[in-house]
Curated annotation (Swiss-Prot):
Organism: Escherichia coli O45:K1 (strain S88 / ExPEC)
Gene3D superfamilies: YehU-like
Taxonomy of the source species: Bacteria, Pseudomonadati, Pseudomonadota, Gammaproteobacteria, Enterobacterales
NCBIfam families linked to this entry: PRK04966.1
Family: Belongs to the UPF0270 family.
Protein name from the UniProt record: UPF0270 protein YheU
InterPro entries noted in UniProt: UPF0270, YehU-like_sf
Gene designation: yheU
């Protein structure tokens, strides 16, 4: 189930994004990016619709994923 990111308080959204970024551990190439930069990137992706917040009833968790990978 999609969760509209706009419905979350700014603090909750920030915490969800930080948790996601810390879990992912993605390699950003030659130059390491700060947590703040990574959070900003994910927030931008949510705002422009490239990424979505998804609630998993099965796992009772919230995740962030590319819109193209989301299947209802």
């Amino acid at each position: 189930m999609l969760i509209p990111w706009q419905d979350l308080s700014p603090e909750t959204l920030e915490n969800l994004i930080e948790s996601f970024v810390l879990r992912e551990g993605t390699d950003y190439g030659e130059h390491e990016r700060t947590l703040e930069q990574k959070v900003s990137d994910v927030k931008r992706q949510l705002q422009c619709g490239e990424a979505v917040l998804v609630w998993s009833e099965l796992h009772e968790t919230v995740n962030i994923m590319p819109r193209s990978q989301f299947r209802e």
